[in-house]
Amino acid sequence: MMTVLEDMLRKTRNGKVHMTLIDPGAKPPQECARIAEEAEMAGTDFIMVGGSTDIDSRAMDEAISAIKAKTDLKVIIFPGSSLMISPKADAIFFMSLLNSGSLEYVVGHQVKAAIPLSAMKIEKIPMAYLVFDPGMTVGRVGKAHLIPRDDEKTALSYALAAQYFGFRLVYFEAGSGSPYHVGENVVRRVKQELDIPVIVGGGIRTPEAAKALAQAGADMIVTGTIAERSVNVYEALHPIVESIKEVGISKIQ
C-alpha cells in the first residue's frame, strides 16, 4: 500500500496539491468533520489537523475520529506541540521550526513526542517548517526569527539546509490569518535549486493568490482560515482548488 508521503510525491509529480487545515482548538469535532466533508467535495487532497493552538491528545482524537467518519481523505497531524498527537491519524508532519530562537521548537517538542509516537502506527513525515513575516500566532509562540516575505537568499539557505539534513518536505508559513502570503519570488527562487517539495500556507485567500504561488513553483498549497470562517466551505474552497489544479494540468502538458 502506498504511504501518505508516497501519495503526496506522486500527486506533486503529476500536478499540484491542495490541503485543508482544520484547527480543533477553534471548532468542535462535528464542525471539524463538516469542514472536512465539504473540503473533500471541493477537491482538496489531504486534511491537516492542528495549527498554532496548543490542545491535548484527547481533543485531537475526537476531532480526527469525527473527520474520518465523514471523509475518505488521509488525515495528517500538523502539531503545535508534543501534546498534539493521536493514533487516529494516518500520518504526522514530524516537523522542526528551523528558524525558531528556541530549541524547544527546533527539537525539544520532537524529543518529548518521539517515544509516544513510536507506539503509534501512524506515518511520520520529516518536514522542515519555516515561518515568514508576519508570522502571526505561530511566529510569536514559536519564537521565530521571521524571514522577510521577499528574502530569497535567506529562504533558499534554510530550504537547502533542510534538504541536506534529510527532511522530505519544506513548509513556508506566513501564519494563520496573515494579511499576506510568502512572496512568489521567494518560492520561484527556491524551486530553482531545491529537489524536495515546497508547501506554502498562510494568507492565501483567493484563487488568484493560490494560482500565482502554484505558478511560481509551490507544490502544495494549504488553506485553513478561509475554510474555518466560511458558512459554505465548498463555495469558498472550490475556486481555490480549481485554480491550482489548472496550473497542475498545464505542468503535465
From Swiss-Prot:
Recorded GO MF terms: magnesium ion binding; phosphoglycerol geranylgeranyltransferase activity
Keyword Transcription regulation: no
Predominant cellular place of this UniProt entry's protein: cytoplasm
Class in the EC hierarchy, top level: transferase
The UniProt record lists the keyword Cytoplasm: yes
Residue positions binding sn-glycerol 1-phosphate: Y171, F172, E173, A174, G175, S176, G177, G202, G203, G224, T225
Ways its activity is controlled: Inhibited by high concentrations of magnesium (>10 mM) and by EDTA in vitro.
Localization (cell): Cytoplasm
Cofactor remark from the record: Cannot use Mn(2+) or Zn(2+).
EC numbers on record: 2.5.1.41
Cofactor: Mg(2+)
Record family assignment: Belongs to the GGGP/HepGP synthase family. Group II subfamily.
Primary role: Prenyltransferase that catalyzes the transfer of the geranylgeranyl moiety of geranylgeranyl diphosphate (GGPP) to the C3 hydroxyl of sn-glycerol-1-phosphate (G1P). This reaction is the first ether-bond-formation step in the biosynthesis of archaeal membrane lipids. Cannot use sn-glycerol-3-phosphate (G3P) as substrate.
Name of the protein described by the UniProt record: Geranylgeranylglyceryl phosphate synthase
